[in-house]
Amino acid sequence: MLELRPTCEHCNKTLPSDSLEARICTYEYTFCVTCVDSVLGNVCPNCGGGFVPRPIRPSKNWKGDNFLGKDPPSTKIKHRPVDPAAHAKFSAPIKNIPPQKR
């Protein structure tokens, strides 16, 4: 189950569980759409994968206790700003490869 991390790991922007700006990679590293587009170039600095919009967990118990009340979002902040120079070097050989082919 997704943790639904509360902030962008680069800029520390608040990303509530219903945020349309949250992006995650397959390992759930979480960034805001602005950082994904303008800083990371859709290359995760931790795994090299791409990003997708983070799903929004239902706020109501529509079925089977699968909702925020039963499984609340994480409150643990993971603020690890990316070094732009190091990321540029890391992402250079893979940034032009589509995420589904990385």
Show where each model-derived region lies.
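Intrinsically disordered, low-complexity regulatory regions in eukaryotic proteins
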Residues: 1-102
